[in-house]
Amino acid sequence: MADIDIKSVNKFYDKVHVIKDFSLKIKEHSFTTLVGPSGCGKSTLLRMIAGLEDINSGTISIGGKEVNNLPPKERGIAMVFQSYALYPHMTVFENMAFGLKIEKKPQEEIDHLVNEAAKILQIEDYLQRKPKQLSGGQRQRVAIGRAITRKPKVFLFDEPLSNLDASLRVQMRVELAKLHEQIDATMIYVTHDQTEAMTLSDEIVVLDKGRISQQGNPLNLYNQPSNIFVASFIGSPKMNLIPAKLINQDKDNLELVLLNKKFQIKQTIKKELKDENITVGLRPENLHISETDDFDWQSKAFVVENLGSNTFVYLESPNGPIIVECESDQNIKTGQLLKIKFDTNKFNLFNDHDSII
């Protein structure tokens, strides 16, 4: 059993309150990613789970056992850092076996565990090489392999792919997903890369200033952010956030003015919101370029980003850029006046307190 239960944890650095009354349950065998901007506390939280940082109050339990006072080696965890932390004078085999030798494991068991991990990660041919003879991706696989040999209950990853170039990051993402399926361990992953979070995770936890802003499966966070912070953080490009005015509300419908046009949308709202300033959130893929007179708004393109498979078009608006995603074969040009149709079924509505309505 390797579930993790964090209850009312606080962490201070002098007078700075970094982690604030933080509670989180992580299911056994799940892949959970902690994301957030720099300084939000995600790496600090990971280090507290690992036992590398003390907590000021609260409890952390792994597999039903409180670990507050246990050293890292007794917590049943293994950690993989952004830095590979390999010994340059040792071979790959020796690096992977180092922790096992410290634990005085029998040589036969060491050989078995190292070779088993090497097979999983497809690095059997590199076992007698030194780290300097390996690529960045191969070195990171060795670091992960060293963690696997310990047979931990929980893997902790602290931005492990940050030092790799773009193509290697894609390759390692695939390998991490495959690894999780193979060994079926509980994994906690810290990153600022939303693509990593979206593609790897069973659950994403978005942190903001030491607190949970939202948690859930990747598609829920992407399609239904609970507040403007998550809406603007999850997704690349981020969700368009457009000020609007609510002018009428009945049991089933809302009428609002957005970019000088009235919209009536079906929305069941529990509380009365008349005359409330709201913000409409709309993903770039939910705005469409119209070739007819059936459109909601028009504006000039001032930046066109053609990515090959798709194109992002940045349009001028009184409230800043509005981004539209379209097919690359539409051949949009900078300065072109475009007619835009909104998918009102995809509107996310936020009130003036930044929370979703």
Task: Label every model-predicted segment.
Residues A50:
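Helix-to-loop junction immediately C-terminal to a conserved catalytic motif
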Residues P72-F229:
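ABC ATPase nucleotide-binding domains
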Residues P237, Q249-I357:
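Non-catalytic connector elements of ABC transporters
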Residues G58-E66:
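Conserved ABC transporter NBD signature motif
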Residues S43-L46, V142:
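ABC ATPase nucleotide-binding domain helices that frame the ATP-binding cleft
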Residues V35-P37:
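The feature captures the beta-strand-to-loop junction immediately N-terminal to the Walker
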Residues F22-T33:
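Pre-Walker A (P-loop) beta-loop-beta motif of ABC nucleotide-binding domains
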